[in-house]
């Protein structure tokens, strides 16, 4: 089985995915696992420490403010969100997962949405 876990933002999103990946590998050592998160999110370090492969999709949070710096940030976030869809689909085409598991955080949105769009099993 080939599984993508997508998560990020906090250890509360990442650690359940790591636990599930470990369980799946324990039951079937041939399970291929890929984690997908953001380029510089804390999830990258946690996944590396656990020994799993990692791919990144640029996505950012939106700020709920009308201040100029928040507006600039949101413009950047909107651009990243627009680019994240094609990047997520490219990862899906290359890895060819049987299942995509999203455990939360804004980093999981592009991968789960792409899985839905191309008809991949997802949770």
Where are these regions (language model features)?
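Conserved small/polar residues in nucleotide/adenosyl-binding loops
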Residues: 121-123
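Conserved nucleotide-sugar phosphate-binding/catalytic loop shared by glycosyltransferases and other
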Residues: 3-10, 30-83
């Amino acid at each position: 089985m080939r599984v993508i876990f997508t998560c990020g933002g906090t250890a509360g999103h990442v650690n359940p995915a790591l636990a599930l990946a470990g369980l799946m590998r324990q039951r079937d050592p041939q399970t291929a696992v890929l984690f997908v998160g953001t380029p510089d999110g804390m999830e990258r370090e946690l996944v590396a420490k656990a020994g799993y492969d990692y791919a990144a999709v640029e996505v950012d949070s939106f700020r709920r403010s009308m201040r100029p710096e928040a507006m600039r940030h949101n413009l950047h976030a909107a651009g990243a969100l627009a680019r994240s869809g094609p990047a997520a689909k490219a990862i899906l085409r290359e890895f060819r997962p049987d299942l995509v598991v999203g455990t939360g955080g804004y980093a999981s949105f592009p991968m789960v949405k792409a899985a839905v769009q191309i008809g991949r099993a997802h949770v």
